[in-house]
Amino acid sequence: MTDFFDCERAQVYHNTGKLSPAQIRNRTGCTHIINGYLFNSKFQPVGWTVIDGKIISRDAYQDWGISIGTDGLPKMLTDRGGSFLSGIPIIKGGSKLYRDLTPDVARSAARTAVGWLPNGKICLWCDKTALTREQLQNKLLGLGVEDALMLDGGGSTQGIFPKGKVTSSRKVPTLLLFWERKTENPTPAPVKPEEPALAWGKAKGLVTDAQLAEPERAVTRQELVETLRRFSAINWKTEGG
């Protein structure tokens, strides 16, 4: 399951209540939700987890992760000042990256990943299809992704998008929430009030609705003759002829 969208804001969610993605989505109103990074047997996140400047977990590495600053936009950076969640960098600038992986992470497994397109849109990958890191990199590059982070996978892979979901019975301590930017409908052009002369002409039957719709259009000779004919008929009735 993949989706591409213009992201308005994102959030790192610390799931202390062991809620399901559906419960979290219902509480927050996010449009997309996916599982976060790795965790230990005590349900504690590993790597860096920072929420609004508060450090939940940390390690010795200063690698790229999902960084969310004051503008609320998720970016692949090393800045841990706002909110931050570790991930395994697998693509940067359109090139594959390789970090040392433990055997349980390196094996072929279901995958969750976040990617960025050159136009700034987000690409989310959340799928039960078993892939190696190399296969996931190839899939994402084929979709046009230029930066990407791999998150927890295997039995942790789970997410909900507007048009689909991937479920798991496993609860995870961190999740990533996204809000898709709403498409704004263009404001219709204001209706220009009729000029007094045109309004009078319409009331007298001298101007048709079609002519009023294009008040700046030049009048043809035929239309001019028709207008004069109607005007003459009105005068004849008024004068009692």
Describe these PLM feature segments.
Residues 1-185:
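Gly/Ser/Thr/Pro-rich low-complexity, intrinsically disordered segments
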Residues 186-241:
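Short, solvent-exposed alpha-helical surface patches in non-cytosolic proteins
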